[in-house]
Design a protein with these regions (language model features):
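Conserved Class I S-adenosyl-L-methionine
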Residues: 183-252
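Short alpha-helix
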Residues: 165-181, 213, 220-223
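Short, glycine-/aromatic-enriched active-site segment of Class I SAM-dependent methyltransferases
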Residues: 146-164
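Class I SAM-dependent methyltransferase SAM/SAH-binding core
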Residues: 52-108
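N-terminal, positively charged/glycine-rich alpha-helical extensions of SAM-dependent methyltransferases
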Residues: 1-25, 34-35
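A short acidic, Gly/Pro-enriched loop at the edge of an enzyme's catalytic core
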Residues: 105-117
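A short glycine-rich, Lys/Arg-flanked "PGG" loop and its adjoining helix->strand segment in the class I
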Residues: 126-142
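Conserved alpha-helix/loop element of class I SAM-dependent methyltransferases that forms part
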Residues: 19-53, 61-67
Length: 252
């Protein structure tokens, strides 16, 4: 039987919590997720130290760039979600980055061959032709991306059974990069265990990571949330698996 008061309190708390930026500190102690062995932030820092002009596409709140110890002289970031733009500008001021608000479906607003490094963590989509266009000859694109079927167990707990995922396969990304004239030099994938200790953590995650359950609202899925609360209370933390892949490509 559902402990309705406890469930509703947890849900209400998570529904009211801020979700700006791309940090996940709110989940500390309430959810866990394994990290890929390739250590994306370290790879970015290594390549930034050798770059003259770099671009971070879909920077979120600027969390990755803010940790780069030796940023290049010219450092630019784009962000397409308005609430994140000001967060990123505040975060990245200290590393001297320029944050440009963009239309997520539009072209990159930069001249051809503007950057010798383009990076992107968890982009909404990758426009491979635009990426190739703004890279200088010999330049590098490095990206950690969401893989096909990520958090499928959580999606199905809310939505019910789903068809096999059709998008975000690493092989498709590599083929698209090659079609745009880039040369793929590294392609890796990882399956990462994630746990949610209470229904509040689930609600906050679904509000934040909007592609897990498109159109998610508490009111729309309250019945499913209460059922999942019962499951967590009875069985312990809910487990799902995130899919990630790393792709690195160069412009000849």
């Amino acid at each position: 039987m559902t402990d309705l008061r406890n469930a509703e309190e947890l849900i209400a708390e998570a529904a009211a919590a801020p979700i700006d930026g791309w940090g996940f500190d709110w989940l500390s102690g309430r959810a866990t997720e394994e990290r890929p062995q390739w250590a994306y932030a370290r790879l970015v820092a290594d390549r930034m130290a050798r770059a003259a002009a770099a671009l971070d596409v879909d920077t979120g709140g600027g969390e990755v760039l803010a940790e780069v110890p030796h940023p290049p002289k010219l450092l630019t970031a784009t962000e397409g979600w308005p609430p994140n733009v000001e967060v990123a500008r505040r975060t990245l001021r200290r590393v001297g980055a320029t944050v440009v608000a963009v239309d997520p479906d539009g072209p990159l607003p930069f001249r051809d061959a503007s950057f010798d490094l383009v990076v992107s963590r968890h982009p909404v989509r990758t426009d491979w032709a635009q990426t190739a266009r703004v890279l200088r000859p010999g330049g590098t694109f490095l990206s950690q991306q969401i893989g096909a079927g990520t958090m499928r167990e959580l999606s199905e707990a809310i939505l019910g059974p789903l068809p096999p995922p059709a998008h975000r396969h690493p092989e498709h990304a590599a083929a698209a990069a090659e079609d745009a004239g880039l040369r793929v030099v590294d392609l890796r994938r990882a399956t990462l265990r994630a746990t949610f200790s209470d229904i509040g953590a689930v609600v906050w995650f679904l509000r934040k990571v909007i592609w897990t359950v498109p159109g998610f609202t508490v009111d729309r899925y309250r019945e499913q949330l209460l059922a999942l609360h019962d499951r967590i209370t009875t069985e312990g933390p809910f487990t799902a698996h995130a899919q990630r892949f790393l792709i690195e490509a160069t412009r000849p």
